[in-house]
Design a protein with these regions (language model features):
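Short beta-strand micro-motifs within the conserved protein kinase catalytic domain, predominantly
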Residues: 57-72
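Conserved short submotifs of the Hanks-type protein kinase catalytic core
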Residues: 69-83
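Activation segment signature within eukaryotic-like protein kinase domains
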Residues: 101-102
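Protein kinase catalytic-loop region centered on the HRD/HxD motif
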Residues: 107-117
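Conserved activation segment of eukaryotic-like protein kinases, specifically the C-terminal portion
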Residues: 152-165
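Conserved catalytic-loop aspartate of Hanks-type protein kinases
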Residues: 177
C-alpha cells in the first residue's frame, strides 16, 4: 500500500493570498471546504468502482479538519502503483504492452460506463502500472456522473486528448473517453 497525504490548503500563504484579494473568513473557509468536497467526490467515485480490476483501488481514507484554523489533512491509503509516465521513462513500451494497456483501459471504461461515469481526462498521467503487467485508471477528479448532468456538459480534460464535442462544449457521453484513449494509444505506438 501507499499513503497519499494532502493538506488543504497546502499552507497559510494560500489563505493569506485569498484574504489579500478581498475574501472574508467565511468565503475562504467555503472555498477550501469545496475543495475537500470535490476530493471526497473523487474518492466516492473510485470506491464505487472498487470491484473493477483496472481501476486504482482506494483502500481507506480519512479527512481530518484542523482545530481553530481553516484546513483539512487528508490521508488516502491506496494500492502501490507506478505512474505510466515514469514507466515509459524507465522502460518504454512495446506494441504488445500498448495493446495490453488498451485492453485494460477498455475494461476500466466499461466499468465506468456501467456506473454512468465519464472520466473526461484519459491521458498518460492518469494511468498506472501495477508491476504485474496490468494497467489501471486513476484520477477521477474531473469525472462526471451522467445522472448528475442535464443538457450541455462542461469542458474538462486535457486538450491534446479531448474529443471534439467536449472541446466545442457540445453534449457528449461516455464515448469521449474512448476517443481520448484512442488518441493516447496512437501516440504511444
Amino acid at each position: 500500500s501507499a499513503v497519499k497525504v494532502m493538506h488543504i490548503p497546502k499552507d497559510n500563504s494560500e489563505i493569506n493570498d485569498l484574504h489579500r484579494s478581498g475574501m472574508d473568513f467565511d468565503s475562504i473557509h467555503t472555498y477550501f471546504e469545496d475543495m475537500v468536497k470535490n476530493l471526497l467526490n473523487e474518492i466516492q467515485i473510485m470506491e464505487s468502482l472498487k470491484s473493477a480490476s483496472n481501476i486504482v483501488v482506494i483502500e481507506d481514507y480519512q479527512i481530518i479538519p484542523r482545530n481553530k484554523e481553516i484546513g483539512w489533512d487528508i490521508y488516502i491509503r491506496m494500492e502501490l502503483l507506478q505512474d505510466l509516465g515514469t514507466f515509459l521513462e524507465d522502460h518504454g513500451m512495446t506494441r504488445q504492452q500498448v495493446l495490453r494497456l488498451g485492453m485494460d483501459m477498455c475494461q476500466a471504461l466499461t466499468a465506468c460506463e456501467q456506473e454512468h461515469i465519464i472520466h473526461r481526462d484519459i491521458k498518460i498521467d492518469n494511468i498506472f502500472f501495477n508491476g504485474f503487467h496490468s494497467f489501471k485508471l486513476g484520477d477521477f477528479g474531473i469525472s462526471k456522473q451522467l445522472e448528475k448532468t442535464q443538457s450541455a456538459l462542461s469542458q474538462k480534460g486535457t486538450n491534446m486528448y479531448m474529443a471534439p464535442e467536449v472541446f466545442r462544449a457540445e453534449k457528449y457521453d461516455h464515448t469521449v473517453d474512448i476517443y481520448s484513449l484512442g488518441i493516447m494509444l496512437y501516440r504511444l505506438l
